[in-house]
A protein has these predicted regions:
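Active-site donor-sugar recognition loop in glycosyltransferases
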Residues: 44, 60-64, 86
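Short alpha-helical segment that forms part of, or immediately flanks, the ligand-binding pocket
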Residues: 46, 69-74, 85-89
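Short acidic alpha-helix that forms the nucleotide-activated donor recognition element
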Residues: 41-52, 74
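Short hydrophobic beta-strand element within catalytic cores of glycosyltransferases
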Residues: 78-81
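Nucleotide-activated donor-binding/catalytic signature segment of Leloir-type glycosyltransferases, i.e.
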Residues: 16-43
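Acidic donor-binding loop of glycosyltransferase active sites
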Residues: 50-64
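A charged, aromatic-enriched C-terminal amphipathic alpha-helix characteristic of glycosyltransferases
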Residues: 110, 124-165
Length: 170
């Protein structure tokens, strides 16, 4: 098992914060079985995801959505994550999801257990079928062209409502 880490505060336009985590990045670079890459382009991440099998995502943030998970699931990666924030809706019942634990030690234990089960089941035929269905779902419902059309329809409906209200008052 090899872990690929793509992480840095540069992506959040806060590169100065990397300094306080330099020891963490250095430890990751020196670990056997870990390939630390820092921040890379979105195109490179999407390419790398197609070469991977599982995304371990032990998030502790109340996400409103998660583009990382969406792109991993579109790349046929199995995702292991907590049921925190909007991750249940984002993952659409495809993730190996577990109940979020606020205590770090308990969270690590639960995440590790579920991740181990996901690794054990990865090569099963039914997993491949589910991952193919997952890819189809995410490529369909998280498609940027479709999202653009939905937003255009939404904004058009607001515009129409404003025009109707304006006509009603005149």
């Amino acid at each position: 098992i090899v872990s690929y880490i793509f992480s840095s505060f540069k992506i959040y336009d806060r590169p100065h914060m990397d300094e306080q985590y330099r020891h963490v990045y250095k430890a990751a670079q020196e670990m056997d079985g870990v390939n630390y890459h820092g921040t890379v382009s979105n195109d490179q991440i999407r390419e790398e995801l197609t070469k991977n099998h599982i995304m371990a995502y032990p998030s502790v943030y109340m996400e409103t959505s998660c583009i990382s998970v969406i792109e991993a699931m579109s790349a046929k990666c199995m995702v292991v994550c907590p049921n925190l924030g909007a991750l249940p809706e984002t993952c659409a019942n495809f993730a190996w999801m577990y109940g979020y634990e606020p205590g770090p030690e308990k969270h690590i234990a639960v995440h590790s257990h579920i991740l181990g089960r996901a690794i054990e089941s990865y090569r099963k035929d039914e997993t491949e079928v589910l991952l193919s269905l997952q890819k189809t779902y995410f490529d369909t419902f998280y498609n940027w062209d479709m999202r653009m059309n939905q937003w255009n329809q939404f904004l058009e409906s607001i515009k129409m409502r404003i025009e109707m209200e304006k006509n009603d008052t005149t």
